[in-house]
Amino acid sequence: ACVGENKQCADWAGPHCCDGYYCTCRYFPKCICRNNN
């Protein structure tokens, strides 16, 4: 399963972002998925 926009994710070990999203830890300690565009 993948997670979508603004959902919590992990760069190294799931949950991972769905296609079209990337994981950012800019909001450390919470990493979230953001749209690639």
From Swiss-Prot:
Domains: entry comment: The presence of a 'disulfide through disulfide knot' structurally defines this protein as a knottin.
Protein family: Belongs to the neurotoxin 07 (Beta/delta-agtx) family. 03 (aga-4) subfamily. Aga sub-subfamily.
Name this protein carries in UniProt: Mu-agatoxin-Aa1e
Disulfide cross-links: C2-C18, C9-C23, C17-C33, C25-C31
Purpose: Insecticidal neurotoxin that induces an irreversible spastic paralysis when injected into insects. Modifies presynaptic voltage-gated sodium channels (Nav), causing them to open at the normal resting potential of the nerve. This leads to spontaneous release of neurotransmitter and repetitive action potentials in motor neurons.
Keyword annotations of the record: Amidation, Disulfide bond, Ion channel impairing toxin, Knottin, Neurotoxin, Presynaptic neurotoxin, Secreted, Toxin, Voltage-gated sodium channel impairing toxin
Molecular function terms, GO-annotated: sodium channel regulator activity; toxin activity
Keyword check for Zinc: no
Expression sites by tissue: Expressed by the venom gland.
InterPro entries documented for this protein: Beta/delta-agatoxin_fam
Compartment(s) of residence: Secreted
Pfam family, one: Toxin_7
Species per Swiss-Prot/TrEMBL record: Agelenopsis aperta (North American funnel-web spider)
Modified residues (Asparagine amide): N37
One GO cellular component, as annotated: host cell presynaptic membrane
Protein's UniProt keywords contain Transport: no
